Amino acid sequence: MLGSGGCRKRNAEVAEESAPVVTLAAELATNGLGDLPGAIYQSQAASPIHWQPWTPETLARAKEANRLVFGVIAIPQQPGFQGVLAALAQNPALVSTINDHYVPVLIDGDASREVGLLTGDLCSEIKRGLQLPLFVWMTYKGDPVAWIPVPKSSGGKVADLFKQSHSMVSQMRADDAENHKTYVMDNSAADNAARRDRISRRKNSKVMSTQPAEDMVRSLRQLNSFYDPSSRTFDEAGGLFPAGAIDLLATAAMQPGLPEEIRSRSLETTRELMIDLLPSAMFDPLDGGVFSARRGNSWTLPSFNRDCVSQVRAAVALLHVHRASGDALVLDKALGLIAYAEKAFTTSEGLFAAGLASESEVAAWLWSVEEIEKALSPEDAAWWIKAAGMKGLGNLPSEVDPRREFFRSNSLALGKTLATYAAEEGQSLESFSLRFEASRKKLLEVRNARLGKVARDDCSHAGATFRMVSAYAAAFGVTGDPKFRDKAVALLDKARAAFAEGPKLRMFSKDAPKSVGAGRAFLYGLAMQAALDVATISPDEKWLVWAEDLATTAAELFTSAEFLKESPDDARILDLPITDLVMLFDDSTAGLISFAEVRLAERERPLVPTFSQLATPLPIYAVERPILHTDLLQATLAREFKVTIVAGEGISPELKLATERLLLRMFQRRAANSKEEVPAGSVKVIFSNGQSRSVTTPEALQEAVLPLPKKS
């Protein structure tokens, strides 16, 4: 014992002699989020945890302090992070541990997108499904040491998860100090080098399709086969609202050149999905909007979260479904989603916020029959109970609530238009609408009282704003209402002023460090999409010029020898070749850039060749897993089965409007050049097989490009 003690004493003396000089920067003694833009950062600016921004300077301070970084990666649209961070902040012992032992760093994985994408790889390495927020311990070099996804749970469970990892990491650090080793640094660096090599091999081993048109058809067959009308299930779609799949299927139903049976099958699958979704509780009948995901395997019980991007993606998909099906209810739902996004996510700057996911209890959103009867008059209560399919024992299927947590509870859903309900009640639309609005407001007031005050996100977000521009443009195309065109143009003007810094983009309307707020490749893809959408419906040439300028800048920032970089070099901290190929949280960068390429190329403004070569191929893995790559497949559909609208001189205002109202992204438009023989007053429609057709009236144009398939 004495010998051991003497040895420990001598080791301690040596360690003390060789211990590095530790400098604790003043910035680490306080919460450093301050006025950092973004909903996540603003929500934690007053936290007792000394959160620091994700910057090179923060990592340099971690090195000086001889501390590991304790990072939390979250995105504002994913629920759970606020409760997890609150559980940490409300535990004084945990706060002290975090502040005294680590450099705590909060990372918005939506804005710093490459970090958000990395969470998928990290979760896969420990054989866990992707779940945010993610706790990650890192060295000052940005090498992950340990990590764990944190499910939404009680404060005690969050504390236990932190303590377990903290204990392990602390013991490794203590062993290093006692034995004069650098195992933690060396091992994490070696692991990250292996990770770098693995990611590189994965991206370099991609097999590209040599027959993209045929493989496009094969992927559509497979996507359609995932839907089973008997069981009403959509295999591999998961629990998210399937906006991407719906959008692809609806556009495939309208795309000339595809085999008739594929178009017919796609239309039928789309209609069946609408039967499942439109009358479901995924659409909130009280406040509007669509919930982004469901709980379990039924659309009767949503995960009650709404963000701006999910509203807009669903709205655009439904607008395309309405084009294909002519269903009035689909259009009603789509325009309702746009109206809800305007109400819920418009910021004080007149732009749009991403939206903070709410973290309320499920029970607060559900109703018993008695609660409806208490809140409304007997007549109105009877109507709501019948229309929403409410039951005394509840309307949730047993497979959704196997433990009967929500016994006698009902979700609310309305599956018809107000005009249909008015006719069923034998009332005029005007009188029924007044009655409906009065009862809706009463129920909403009761629900809001249960939910309590919900924080509103007022941080203008470039991605959400560009998405809204595209939604307005799509709504104009479907309805022909000029107010939507005016909104699209006005919002894009505002967005360019707020989010463009010279030729580059930023995520927030306020200054932020590049690693926090510089535009990633994904944002450039969204901006190009919005600019091209507006260029299609507006006579102003500046939007096409801006889209081309954005493409040039993106090529300079994100082109590497072999892959499409997600982060510009001056914003990158992680030394990993991260690229965005899969629809992990949203559309993928690969899909957005591919779509921009085909649209610009058909307007005779091609991308830089090295950039174009990264954007145009169709990987075989996208064909084999279509549900995860619907955006890239849609771009391929537009490329391989392209339809080009070439306008001659002097076309009538009516024909010009008809060309503007065609499918924004699937049919490419341009003015005839001097070498093309397009008669004055006419439009030439050029198909992918080389055939063409000249038309002079809106009706002839419609017949040329949008003859719907027959039902199989």
PLM feature spans:
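N-terminal low-complexity, Ser/Thr/acidic repeat segments characteristic of secreted
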Residues: 14-15
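Anionic-ligand anchoring segments at beta-strand to alpha-helix junctions in alpha/beta enzyme folds, i.e.
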Residues: 80-82
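N-terminal leader/targeting and pre-domain segments
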Residues: 18-65
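C-terminal motif of bacterial Sec signal peptides marking the signal peptidase cleavage site
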Residues: 3-6
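Loop/turn elements at helix/coil->beta-strand transitions in domains of secreted/extracellular proteins
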Residues: 65-69, 100-103, 132-133, 140
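Thiol-based oxidoreductase modules, predominantly thioredoxin-like and allied folds used
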Residues: 46-56, 72-77, 87-119, 671
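Glycan-recognition and catalytic cores of secretory/periplasmic carbohydrate-active enzymes
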Residues: 9-10, 20, 32, 36-37, ...
